[in-house]
Amino acid sequence: MKRRGLKFLALGISAALLVGTLAACGSKKDSASKSSGDNSFVITLYPDVAPITCENFEKLVKDGFYDGLKFHRVVEDFMAQGGDPKGDGTGGSTDTIKGEFSQNGVENTLSHTRGVVSMARSNDPDSASSQFFICYGDESFLDGQYAAFGKVTEGMDVVDSFVKVERSMGSDGAVSSPNTDIIMENVKMIDDDSDGNPRVEITMHDFLK
């Protein structure tokens, strides 16, 4: 699908990023393209941009909440979404948090570009809990509507490989539902980056076997 058509589709399936209402790469590679290890990738959190969101995400990671959960929705050239204990886009963690984005009265300067991680939510701007999505390209039309809080800084090739899994038509009207579970086997905090930003390493189950 051409990019223009994709944008139209993305707008039409914004529900893919909504929880409970059922949720361009250049030729030059950056460091995010390099895998941090076998089937793992690293997300750097930016608490200066979204402190409430980062605190919530870090707590869930430390509690082991994400271990064994899957990416239940993968839309090529758009995003990959996971973090739902129900595995179908309708669940979340116990607590919801304030949506840190401009339409909810909070300044957020992190744009939804390739590798950026943001929170999924329902129509209620303060309904985000555990579900998150990773952008495959420039999805800046989502800016101001969702709380971007981190970025894949190592191993984006692993996230890219999600689209290699055969998918069926999802409830969002797109070919987005993986026929093979894409499972987060282990999610843990690792050393902060050189600027003191927290980092999370996600090791995936070998879903391409």
Predicted feature locations:
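Cyclophilin-like peptidyl-prolyl cis-trans isomerases
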Residues: 2-14, 18-209
